């Protein structure tokens, strides 16, 4: 995402309520989430919705559901949402980008799971293989 677009997004979020912020970020995922990552047959939008749905079905808190929905927002903020697989070779730490960006607008109960999701996934992959 280009710097001017990020600044425009920040301006919208700064003057928005928590519900409006969530809606604005959902629009970003809806607009930019049409590409797929890795070798999966699923788009970023589908992945975000699946994660949030699983969290809801497991009776997680609203904050955890929000984290589940926005956990890969960093891919979009760093421009890794353009069907390029460059990020597989050049880690831009999308989890830290998203957590840092969202920390201005959401509590730690939302941003901490986002920050930790990559490390958690790597751990699970290592013990389940």
For the regions a language model picked out, list residue spans one by one:
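Metal-dependent phosphohydrolase cores
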Residues: 1-129
